[in-house]
Amino acid sequence: MDSKEYLISYGWKEGEAFREGGLKRPILVKHKRDKKGLGNAPGGNDGEAWWERLFDGHLKNLDVSTDSNNGSIKFTQNEAVATAVSKSSSPLYRWFVKGEGLKGTITNLGKKEEASFVVSSASSSKGKKRRRRDEDDNKVKRKKLKKDKKTSNDSESKKKKKKKSKKESKKGKKSKHSSDEGDKSKHKKSKKSKKHKKEESSARRDRKEHI
């Protein structure tokens, strides 16, 4: 179906918009026909060649020479190459599990011992620092546990003392109450005995008067 003829059949003219104030030209779209990533400028640099720079830096630190007698190639490393990011500080490198290296055709015949010594000393110093940090952390944790135990023991002893003081106060109140009741009963008995004596004396007087 031809879209142009279809629109002309409804009264549309070429070069005019469908409505008043509408677009007279179509929206231009840039088609991407290459296989590069999004956001890449056409004709620009595809990316920084970081791998080439790193490879060249490693090659500069290597000394490759041939032996005149045997005709073999000697592979020596002059300096220990330091990485840009330290293994201890990088959070991604901590979870990285290092596997076996790829074996090449060139054997390490004349490798110097100084580079290996530097690497081993650095690794040993890192291990010592980690051990010291772990020991310090353990000491701090032990001190905190001791403080918590002391505070808990002090609180328990205070609670026990409060309970004992409450019990003693209750016992003292009970003893006072019992002593007060005993005094009241004694006072009542003394009053009754006095009344009884008065009645007996009055009865004796009456008997004497009758006689």
Curated annotation (Swiss-Prot):
Compositionally biased intervals (Basic residues): 140-149, 158-176, 185-197
Gene Ontology CC: nucleolus
Keyword Nucleus (UniProt): yes
Example GO BP: ribosomal small subunit biogenesis
UniProt-annotated location(s): Nucleus, Nucleolus
SS bond list: none
Keyword Nucleus: yes
Bias-annotated ranges (Basic and acidic residues): 198-211
Sorted UniProt keywords: Nucleus, Ribosome biogenesis
Region named Disordered: 115-211
Bias-annotated ranges (Low complexity): 116-125
Known function: Trans-acting factors of the ribosome biogenesis process.
Subunit (UniProt): Forms homooligomers. Associates with ribosomal complexes.
Protein name as annotated: Protein TMA23
Source organism: Saccharomyces cerevisiae (strain ATCC 204508 / S288c) (Baker's yeast)
Gene name in the database record: TMA23
